[in-house]
Amino acid sequence: MSKFKVIEIKEDARPRDFEAFQLRLASPEKIKSWSYGEVKKPETINYRTLKPERDGLFCAKIFGPIRDYECLCGKYKKMRFKGVKCEKCGVEVANSKVRRSRMGHIELVTPVAHIWYVNSLPSRIGTLLGVKMKDLERVLYYEAYIVENPGDAFYDNESTKKVEYCDVLNEEQYQNLMQRYENSGFKARMGGEVVRDLLANLDLVALLNQLKEEMAATNSEAKKKTIIKRLKVVENFLNSNLNANTDSDEAVPNRPEWMMITNLPVLPPDLRPLVALDGGKFAVSDVNDLYRRVINRNTRLKKLMELDAPEIIIRNEKRMLQEAVDALFDNGRRANAVKGANKRPLKSLSEIIKGKQGRFRQNLLGKRVDFSGRSVIVVGPKLRMDQCGLPKKMALELFKPHLLAKLEEKGYATTVKQAKKMIENKTNEVWECLEEVVKGHPVMLNRAPTLHKLSIQAFHPVLVEGKAIQLHPLVCAAFNADFDGDQMAVHVPLSQEAIAECKVLMLSSMNILLPASGKSVTVPSQDMVLGIYYLSLEKAGAKGSHKICTGIDEVMMALESKCLDIHASIQTMVDGRKITTTAGRLIIKSILPDFVPENSWNKVLKKKDIAALVDYVYKQGGLEITASFLDRLKNLGFEYATKAGISISIADIIVPNDKQKAIDEAKKQVREIQNSYNLGLITSGERYNKIIDIWKSTNNVLSKEMMKLVEKDKEGFNSIYMMADSGARGSAAQISQLAAMRGLMTKPDGSIIETPIISNFREGLNVLEYFISTHGARKGLADTALKTANAGYLTRKLIDVAQNVKITIEDCGTHEGVEINEITADSSIIETLEERILGRVLAEDVIDPITNSVLFAEGTLMDEEKAKILGESGIKSVNIRTPITCKAKKGICAKCYGINLGEGKLVKPGEAVGIVSAQSIGEPGTQLTLRTFHSGGTASTDLQDRQVSAQKEGFIRFYNLKTYKNKEGKNIVANRRNAAILLVEPKIKTPFKGVINIENIHEDVIVSIKDKKQEVKYILRKYDLAKPNELAGVSGSIDGKLYLPYQSGMQVEENESIVEVIKEGWNVLNRIPFASEILVEDGEPVVQNIKAGEKGTLKFYILKGDGLDRVKNVKKGDIVKEKGFFVVIADENDREAKRHYIPRESKIEFNDSEKIDDANTIIASAPKKERKVIAEWDAYNNTIIAEIDGVVSFEDIEAGYSADEQIDEATGKRSLVINEYLPSGVRPTLVIAGKGDKAVRYQLEPKTVIFVHDGDKIAQADILAKTPKAAAKSKDITGGLPRVSELFEARKPKNAAVIAEIDGVVRFDKPLRSKERIIIQAEDGTSAEYLIDKSKHIQVRDGEFIHAGEKLTDGVVSSHDVLKILGEKALHYYLISEIQQVYRGQGVVISDKHIEVIVSQMLRQVKVVDSGHTKFIEGDLVSRRKFREENERIIRMGGEPAIAEPVLLGVTRAAIGSDSVISAASFQETTKVLTEASIAGKFDYLEDLKENVILGRMIPVGTGLYGEQNLKLKEQE
């Protein structure tokens, strides 16, 4: 860093050009130099004259005059005496503002400790002296002595225990030692003075060296910790002047004795005001009371000392002085808070700056501004996109100064006074001038809560009558505004720069896209959607159907003359082609720009289609075209919604006729289940789950039935159906509550009540049903209130951690990236690869899997078209650049960030991407929370998965899969992990019989086949192959990766497939549970109907080696018999448009070289209609099966002790159920003793039902027991927000799973201290040991192979573990997919890059493992930037650099650990941050946003980046 000069700030100066801000401890001399005089008296003002008392807390002589340029006695008045000191009253004539900056001081008779350095952990004074905080307090509060000079003193008579320097003694010990060793130089004292002397005598450099030696000498971790604590404080003191200029007097480092106060500074009086209220009372700032007590006690102490009072009285007075100063600095930190007259604690200096009402957050980060007003909003449908209606009354006030100037300029008024009078009388000239002033002067509108940047937008005002602001209907979505009484604030930009920014950057017509997702935010909603939907509908047999019209004018004439219905199907010419459309759609076409293709408008337009249309117009046409198009769309929508005259009537709500039948059927099923529960055939959990499933499916059937009826009603013109179908208002779920049945409800705790509400709202609810309904409704409202606060807090934390992230350079030049693929949860796709790659820059070439040529080169920016090509090419994973891998020194580079979603272009340097990201994640947080009650508390849980089935075609490969055959001859999965069933298609087939060989060379894998005569080699890229841990489902995804079914040295037949492409995979544990039944064989083909997907000519091929050979004799009706059969669809230029693999047993539906047109044509068909089921299992229970034949014995399973007996009444069978709560140390276990000494143990979880008896003989794969899965809870969004904040806070979960750190084989060792010991042994001989609590359920078996990152026990994976074991890229994948699951599950689209920006901030600190020669200490958390700079400095000097490991900090910790002092202090834990910074003399280089806002400077992003540089604007030709 460069050296800085310290600026002396003059009294009235407002320096703009300072570059840094440093916090330091103030020396007593410094405090004196600030002071303008000593405050000697506790008086404030004279109650009669109301003038400040001399030498008092408000003294004018010390602090300056009360009135501008006027001394207290009135001898000197006016400017011309500036700087004169009055002889009579001693007041200097000056501006009264100096009372805000001039300080005084109080000379304390005895040094007093500053409470921040005593009481905030770790206690700085205590640490330096090596004294415990409690002991230090006893010394300071005169309860104990501290040894200043031990002399030759010993504690015991035998002289073995020596008295050490800084030992703390009680009264008795002190008297004892004094008697015996007074002459040997023993000396101990108590109180502030001795502590100050001890601190003054410290030689920090010597102490530092001594501590370093001790550190090197010790082996105990605990000792190391305490030494490191002391080292940190000592180093902070020594380094506290590193950046000061050596020639200035500021270069002295902080001294420890400055933590003791001898001169107490007094705050300028105007910062602790005393205001006269009417009625002769005064409102006083609490600080004055606290100062008064200090002064009183100080003067009393002075008097007592002059009188030579007894020691005990003086001590008491000194203690009281210490307490008074403590209270002034931080009241209530120690002991009880000092209370004022009204029995509430006084607000001390610390309280004034911290918290929401403190100086930082209340007055510095957010200020009230002038030229603003607020009013209620109403809709302004006639406005243009960039206009708002401003009430004349408001405009008159807001633009008053402009208006006064205008009136004078026009000559209507000669003086300001006259102009003011005109405005008061509201003459005609005033209105005329107001129109002119307002023209071309934009205003900003803001709706609280301001959750993202679109909550403040600029508009051109249009003056309107009335008192309400008019708002354009399309910008409501961005503001989240509606017209039920919302209010908005208006702000007037004043400077020319501000006005220019409003016009160029903030106009609402410029902000069409959401920065969170890049989707358009100005999409028509509600009435507008309804109107456009109505207009685009088609009605069979409407008036004038099948007519031919030349164009829109003819259609309009026909409509006017009533010979054509708006919904009639007509034919017309568009772009030289004859098309069939409707009259209404032609009207829509007439407002569209010419470049919109027919398939975008010639269909029924629902809300999603309209949104897609707006997006398309924006992408193709740009801002101006889109803005005017949106206005036309809005007008059209409103017009036809009005003309349609859609209304709601009770006749629109149609109840299905067979509702009662369905309900009776469901009730019958429920009775059956209840009976089988009573007979003991199923557990209570199963009963509950099954009943809920029955009612769910009944509800679904009824809803579907009802929707069909409503849809058919009035030929699709049923009002309610139109509203829901168009997306204008309501949903199918809500209609089904109106017309089918209300369904299952939830209790306030989120569990589902098993009796549903059978009535619907049309029939009406009975009393019980109504009562159950209220639960859900009430819960929704309560949740909303609670969660809004949480979401707001999350946003604040995110903003704080990300505020300093901005785009600094174009390209950081890194080649590193992160591999991404689609995010899936279970079997549903959460986010496709196409969505994830949009707007990102590639970090590696993308290779086309079919042609093996480079599809896109490294460094390509993926726009919509490229992303689409990529999506269609069948590529499953891509390497992209991300903020996490960016190597820019500060901030992020544009290439690693990608497209700025708000503009759709590559981001420019200076963009505040951190803030945008935080807003994008936080804003839907509040949305999520506010959305709970819309479904009225009706329950929603997905039907539980009972099976997996193949969605694609290919053939089956078992990876590591072992199965058992049970008595029924079924195949049962025997693996618990590290196995999978893959669906593959062949990529390379063997040209001849031979031996396979596989070798790894650098980035390539070479597969070769060899027989006696010949050898062929195939080269594959290493990262295209699926890794073992990916196949096992530990990390990453395997779709599209390559799989090698054979190992080196195996013999392979001719035409066998040796390299395969994985199309789908189901790994054991995550997708296929243990003990599932497998319904496919290894190598079995899976046949689906294959659709063409493109139009063109069919060509059939067969795979030979790694190339395709043409097969021409294929006819319709052939059955494929051979592996490796492909069909290619060639387009008109004979290029390959699409390629499909056709598995064996498929039936070909076309001849070779035949032309096909439609994309949905089936080329090859499957013999069976339904999808191929891969595996099935019990949906309600986890099954435990026997792994060997043998005899069962029970351990710790005893009826009435650890288990309960249940008797089945019908059959008389007894079964044991493990109790839910077990005594400690009791672990119910089933043991199977097999042949020889083979034994297998099964530890049982609570609630497990046991199906065997002690001593039973059993066979392999028999069912031993079942554990019910947890009862289904309704998915409320609560999972959402707390989950997101848990991830961002990187909290260690309560029930964290123990994770394997290395790949290897599991071994169980002897239990240690009632904990299980698991050892993992790797192939290379390393091993890792884990001790696991007995309460945890272990999920691995002895002898199993496990991958790093897999869970050993049940529980939640902690993100810290992911980072530690699998590294930063795996953490990136984990956090993003977890967070996206929450948001996508709620239908909220957020681009990954926003989450990545936050994650990169959570990883911005590293933990020093080895300090080398640097100034760091091991265990330090330092920012990567500081770490890098320090290492570079040490390397330049030829020293050892430090080594560090990455750490993941939660957003709160990361924000407090900010490099900027001001920013950290204004976030949380203000006192702690300031204490630390002052000792270390920390610098704040004012690089980020927050600290500049606080100091009132331009923020260094966007246009503020160019700050003081003079910009020249030139007009475009």
Swiss-Prot record:
Give the protein's recorded name: DNA-directed RNA polymerase subunit beta'
- Which class of enzymes does this protein belong to? transferase
Q: What are the annotated disulfide bridges?
A: none
**Gene Ontology MF, one:** magnesium ion binding
- Organism taxonomic ancestry: Bacteria, Pseudomonadati, Campylobacterota, Epsilonproteobacteria, Campylobacterales
Q: Does this entry carry the keyword Magnesium?
A: yes
Function of the protein: DNA-dependent RNA polymerase catalyzes the transcription of DNA into RNA using the four ribonucleoside triphosphates as substrates.
Residues annotated to bind Zn(2+) 2:
812, 886, 893, 896
Q: Which source organism?
A: Campylobacter jejuni subsp. jejuni serotype O:23/36 (strain 81-176)
So what EC number does this one have? Answer: 2.7.7.6
The record's annotation in InterPro entries points to: DNA-dir_RpoC_beta_prime, DNA-dir_RpoC_beta_prime_bact, RNA_pol_asu, RNA_pol_N, RNA_pol_Rpb1_1, RNA_pol_Rpb1_3, RNA_pol_Rpb1_3_sf, RNA_pol_Rpb1_4
Membrane-spanning intervals of the chain: none
Q: Does the keyword Zinc apply?
A: yes
Stated family: Belongs to the RNA polymerase beta' chain family.
